[in-house]
């Protein structure tokens, strides 16, 4: 199972092919919804273009998708049904986040000297995701 990675630059080029995406659910993959006012969690339709784009990335095997949401864990069943109904492919999901700013903190060092995290903000309920991430699948 030994793989010769070649030079350090070869290694950098190899690992740059792989990404982990933390993707908010409501307003990004499905139309925005809430717990207390309609439309309620699990009831909204998907944002087709964003779903299709992420599914294509997921199918490459080089993009790991973690869905993030402020939905409570108590909404897990209806959320998972909605994800299945809309055909959303993902690897993991995180519930119970604050409905507030989210920041990713990551390290970098000699084995990965390039920036190791980015942030993308899109307008709620739009199909802009591919425009911001278009180079990921290449």
Regions found by a protein language model. Give the residues of each.
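Conserved alpha/beta core of the MobA/IspD/sugar-nucleotide pyrophosphorylase nucleotidyltransferase superfamily
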Residues: 1-18
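HAD-like aspartate-dependent phosphatase fold
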Residues: 18-138
């Amino acid at each position: 199972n030994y793989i010769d990675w070649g030079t350090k630059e070869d290694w950098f080029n190899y690992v740059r092919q792989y990404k982990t995406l933390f993707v908010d659910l409501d307003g990004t993959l499905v139309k925005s919804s809430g717990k207390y006012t309609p439309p309620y969690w699990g009831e909204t339709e998907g944002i087709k273009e964003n779903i299709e784009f992420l599914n294509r990335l997921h199918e490459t095997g080089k993009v790991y998708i973690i869905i993030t949401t402020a939905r409570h864990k108590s909404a897990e069943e209806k959320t998972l049904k909605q994800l299945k109904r809309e055909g959303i492919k993902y690897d993991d999901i995180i519930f119970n986040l604050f409905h507030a700013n989210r920041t990713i903190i990551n390290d970098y060092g000699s084995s990965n000297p390039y920036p190791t995290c980015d942030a993308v903000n899109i307008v709620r309920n739009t199909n802009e995701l591919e425009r911001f991430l278009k180079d990921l699948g290449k």
